[in-house]
Amino acid sequence: MDKAVSKTNRMAAEISQHGVKEYLAQQQHKGLLRFLTCGSVDDGKSTLIGRLLHDSAQIYEDQLASLKNDSAKMGTTGEAIDLALLVDGLQAEREQGITIDVAYRYFSSDKRKFIIADTPGHEQYTRNMATGASTCDLAVILVDARYGVQTQTKRHAFIASLLGIRHFVVAINKMDLLGFDEQVFNRIRNDFSEFVKGFGELDIHFVPLSALNGDNVVEPSLHTPWYQGGTLLELLETIDTQRELSALPARFPVQYVSRPNLDFRGFAGTLASGVIKVGDQVVALPSGKRSKVERIVTFDGDLPEVTAGQAVTITLEDEIDISRGDLLALPDSAPQVANQIIADLVWMDEKPLQLGQLYDIKVAGKKTQASVTAIDYVVDVNTLARSSAASVEGEGLGLNAIARVTLELTEDIVFDAYSLVRDTGGMILIDRLSNATVAAVMVVSGQHVSKQVSSPFSAFELEFNALVRKHFPHWQAIDISKLGA
């Protein structure tokens, strides 16, 4: 309670001393870190986040009062406060004592602002974990010191790596139950390091802690004199997760065309990577038409340049046809344009993947249709072994499966490899009937394939068939353009 009060008083004192504007400016200029917590069920993810918020003085009096009432009602921790209830918001989660949905929490320290994604540990909710990982820069992987590296721990580490996360903090929890044994810590560190050897270059930190008691979460523990590293909060504050997005090729996905009057036509969006300056020649893709940047417009006035992460409106010197879903880039570092891609895929639907079925696909504001035409191989996340498509023949690719696949699209899309630019290399597949997101797609490569074949059908019949398949997917009409003569 004292920490909550001191937090309130400290904020009031800072505002009184510096004024509201300066206080808000200080908060605005703090760096932002998005990270997720994941691991096997009951490793203590929600408790760890609750402890992190509590010990860093981020909980206020009304929250603590409510938490005490909820803890007494649940009775899971005796007379002590159940910090996991701060995060486990769904009624089903509280009753079962597990995390089902991805729970987001926000807090800040003196050095950084944080967005936490508390992801599920159960295997059937791995798809939720993939959703949380897709926007994070760092993963906190929890390991129960009693059990070591488990199957779900491996699955989460692999998915986090697959989704572009290169920074890991392995939090070895419940060390208090094993007397803070250094040998246990070293064994788990070696096991995890051995497993991720094939994941490429990773930045990994290990920390022994007790989320229940607070050891090495915010304050250093007296029980681990053999550990010379920082606490969990210190690591989160100091690990450099900047991707140097401004050094990457410029990518400006057009979110919408702004036309407030006849004298203004601009293209609004957020620069995903790189830098674009006034006067730069840009190419609009997939059309390939070129022009020069005339203005970079914001609410606060024009800018000479825009850097990655900024939301702006760009106007061009020439009137060229650009619409939502198109992309502006610099000609000497333009992305690829293709209608066939090879990608890693995480299947998120209970209904198995059907080869040849038409799905909606979205990437950087662009929406079109695609079908998976081949499964190149399936990945066993426990061993990272690759098995052929024959291993899922008949059953299809099931929930939580990970595979390398080939997709064919009904029209050209603009893309990068996911390892280069997340925003233009990450896609989602959507079931056209239920509108459910069924897969996360990370592009590896692509090519343009000519689809001109002799057909016994007239142009009208082909166009009418395409119209029916687009607007009446529940009719399950076949694509007659793929039928032979």
From Swiss-Prot:
Residues 30-243 form the tr-type G domain. One of its GO terms (molecular function) is ATP binding. Pathway: Sulfur metabolism; hydrogen sulfide biosynthesis; sulfite from sulfate: step 1/3. GO terms for biological process: hydrogen sulfide biosynthetic process; sulfate assimilation; sulfur compound metabolic process. Disulfide bonds: none annotated. Residues 97-101 are annotated as: G2. Residues 210-212 are annotated as: G5. It comes from the Bacteria. Pfam families: GTP-eEF1A_C, GTP_EFTU. Residues 118-121 are annotated as: G3. Residues 39-46 are annotated as: G1. GTP binds at residues 39-46, 118-122, 173-176. Keywords: ATP-binding, GTP-binding, Nucleotide-binding, Nucleotidyltransferase, Transferase. It catalyses: sulfate + ATP + H(+) = adenosine 5'-phosphosulfate + diphosphate. CDD domains: CysN_ATPS, CysN_NodQ_II, CysN_NoDQ_III. Its EC number is 2.7.7.4. Residues 173-176 are annotated as: G4. InterPro entries: CysN_GTP-bd, CysN_II, CysN_NoDQ_III, G_TR_CS, GTP-eEF1A_C, P-loop_NTPase, SO4_adenylTrfase_lsu, T_Tr_GTP-bd_dom. NCBIfam families: CysN, PRK05124.1. Heterodimer composed of CysD, the smaller subunit, and CysN. PANTHER family: TRANSLATION FACTOR. With CysD forms the ATP sulfurylase (ATPS) that catalyzes the adenylation of sulfate producing adenosine 5'-phosphosulfate (APS) and diphosphate, the first enzymatic step in sulfur assimilation pathway. APS synthesis involves the formation of a high-energy phosphoric-sulfuric acid anhydride bond driven by GTP hydrolysis by CysN coupled to ATP hydrolysis by CysD. Belongs to the TRAFAC class translation factor GTPase superfamily. Classic translation factor GTPase family. CysN/NodQ subfamily. This is Sulfate adenylyltransferase subunit 1. It comes from Shewanella oneidensis (strain ATCC 700550 / JCM 31522 / CIP 106686 / LMG 19005 / NCIMB 14063 / MR-1). The lineage of its organism: Bacteria, Pseudomonadati, Pseudomonadota, Gammaproteobacteria, Alteromonadales.
